[in-house]
Amino acid sequence: TVSGRQPLKHVKEGRIHQPLDHFNRQAVNTFPQRFFVNEAYWQRPDGPVFLFIGGEGPIFEFDVLAGHHVDMAEEHRALLLAVEHRFYGDSINPDSLKTENLADLSSQQALADLAVFHQYISQSFNLSHRNTWISFGGSYSGALSAWFRGKFPHLVYGAVASSAPVKAKLDFSAYNNALNSCCLAVVQEAFAAVEVALMGGNVSQVAVDFGCCQIPKDPDDQIELMQNLADIFMGTVQYNEEGFLMSINELCGLMTNKSEAYEEEMKIYRSTSEEPCLDISHEKAVKDLMDTSLHSSRRTARQWTYQTCTEFGFYQTCEDATCPFSGMLTLQVDTQLCPLLFGISQHSLPARITFTNTYYGGDKPHTHRVLYVNGGIDPWQELSVVQDRTEEEEEAQTIFIEDTAHCADMTSRRVTDRRSLKKARKEIENHVARWLKTAAQEKMEKRGV
């Protein structure tokens, strides 16, 4: 219980029938969009509304029960909402995930969903201009939070965008720059050793060493292996100590001990894997991505791959000389999935990325009352807003947390939090409180009070 209340009893799940295509007035087909509501803290009828926006995956009751936005909702007596992104989780196009149906999957359609959802909730709870809406999100949904405020400023008064990659980028090689420089060389050495073993024909030994389900004889399978190994390091850097397998310092500590780099990489993989063997079949990976049935909706890879092909890129390549992983991880390898899975030409990708940045403003958007929060060791900060436009803004629009990783600010307060994280959360709280106070003052002025 919190403040004598039992929030779980106040959580309700609902569905709203959204148009599959908001921009075609002749289209009549709909899909069910899932949402959660928590009224435990809400001060009727004029309390604020805190909207948690779902990203590239399912939402959960947890999204209206825990997190920094929930802590603030309790303080400000807000109505809590969480809404699922179209085509993820249970909010699926009932006609399957075939390519022709994915045409309605885009961030633009998702923002239109939010606008319709705003209207639906306003009618359902008899809300009015007296209820101030603030949106929250992290990573892709953080970008949606910023864009929702940017495109629909009359609906949402302020937005918190945590670790939000608002700039689309085709070749996101800069993702790899965040790896701790102290173990950069030894990681490069380890990946080079695996490559040498593969190129030297020692594929059977590599399969044994890394517990592969298949012997990586095919070049595509070898690339799958290298991507699997790189993912361990990428995930560690992205989330650092926020609940991932190990921290950067722990990983670097293992990599820089007296053993051979290859052996250490092998041990690290085996210690992090929960599977009986490492599936490196490229053919199976592609087959999984081609699965269009609704039962595969919990696996988000097909939908998100489509969005990377049509809107964002975000391909974490390794052709840059500074990349510590394998040079086998190329832009060509990543983008060849676009024509293979969806019939989208690789040559069309740059224009699609340019459109996204033109439409939203990239990392230099002219947004007001959007707070961009980023961690100093989060690779995605490269695509977010990290500097204030001081000459245009009355208040800061960025918070930079020197020693934290991806979306660290979004969790509830903990006694073990770093001082910098506690300070950042306090800054976020101050912004939200200031927005609510300003909104209340504006409403009083309009009423002539």
Each language-model region and where it sits:
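Catalytic-loop region of hydrolases
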Residues: T1-L79, D90, L97, D104, ...
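Glycine-rich "HGGG/HGxG" loop immediately N-terminal to the catalytic nucleophile
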Residues: F87-E100, L170, D409-M410
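A catalytic-pocket lid/entrance helix-loop region that shapes and gates access to the active site
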Residues: H154-L254
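Alpha/beta-hydrolase fold nucleophile elbow
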Residues: L127-Y140, L144-S145
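Loop/turn elements at helix/coil->beta-strand transitions in domains of secreted/extracellular proteins
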Residues: D46-V49, H76-L79, H129-T132, H154-Y157, ...
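Short beta-to-alpha linker loops that shape the active-site pocket of alpha/beta-hydrolase fold enzymes
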Residues: E56, E84-Y88, N93, P165, ...
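C-terminal subdomain of alpha/beta-hydrolase-fold enzymes, centered on the catalytic histidine
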Residues: D221-V449
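Alpha/beta-hydrolase active-site loop
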Residues: N101-F125, C212
